[in-house]
């Protein structure tokens, strides 16, 4: 959050807003202290039902979506590091993403980092029956967990992970709610390593310019 606060301070006077949404089943209890400690001056919300992840097909954090003043997505879900605290693990330098973000804020739809509709369609993940069923299974697991039935919740969390194996959010949240080794026979780090390490866990954002700068309309 400190990284986002620094970005907000730098860009807030240029018609730029940040809405951060913590995806946390335990809500204020777990996410609240982090927000309080960060003292953000941008909008910080907590999503106990993981609705944002469901609606935007987000599978990991930190994930950013760029939305313009007309409510149109101009860049879809992608890894969004705004500082280098986790660079040793992720292997990602935050500078290219930050430069692209600043370029968009400055130039709007003329920014070379705004995606064309064709490219957006290629990048957007379309819901299929497995993804939809995974969300339903995860929601049922959350309901059972909050009702005090963790043992009954675990099979539904497992089903969500099986149906949507790309969702690290499902793994991260489920493992945090119980003893992962005991209930799932694995740990989060084990799963990252099994998938191929940090490069698979954090695929770099596609910051290739959409068009040549001179091709943008004046």
Kindly give the residue locations of the regions a language model identified.
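Short coil turns that delineate tetratricopeptide repeat
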Residues: 131, 163-165
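Alpha-helical linker/edge segments of TPR/alpha-solenoid repeat scaffolds
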Residues: 177-205, 218
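Thiol-/selenol-based redox modules, centered on thioredoxin-like
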Residues: 68-149, 178
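Short, internal strand/loop/helix patches
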Residues: 32-61, 65-67
């Amino acid at each position: 959050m400190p990284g986002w606060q620094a970005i907000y301070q730098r860009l807030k006077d240029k018609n730029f807003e940040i809405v951060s949404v913590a995806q946390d089943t335990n809500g204020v209890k777990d996410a609240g202290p982090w927000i309080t400690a960060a003292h953000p001056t941008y909008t910080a919300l907590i999503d106990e039902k993981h609705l944002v992840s469901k609606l935007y097909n987000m599978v990991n954090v930190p994930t950013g979506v760029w939305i313009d003043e007309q409510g149109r997505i101009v860049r879809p879900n992608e890894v969004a590091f705004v500082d280098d605290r986790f660079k040793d693990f992720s292997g990602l330098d935050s500078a290219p993403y930050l430069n692209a973000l600043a370029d968009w804020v400055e130039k709007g739809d003329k920014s070379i980092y705004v995606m064309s509709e064709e490219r957006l369609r290629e990048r957007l993940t379309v819901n299929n029956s497995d993804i939809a069923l995974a969300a339903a299974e995860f929601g049922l697991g959350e309901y059972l967990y909050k009702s005090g039935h963790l043992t009954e919740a675990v099979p539904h969390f497992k089903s969500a992970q099986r149906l949507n194996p790309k969702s690290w959010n499902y793994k991260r949240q489920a493992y945090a709610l119980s003893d992962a080794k005991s209930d799932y026979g694995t740990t989060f780090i084990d799963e990252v390593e099994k998938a191929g390490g940090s490069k698979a866990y954090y695929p770099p954002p596609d910051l290739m310019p959409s068009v040549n700068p001179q091709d943008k309309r004046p």
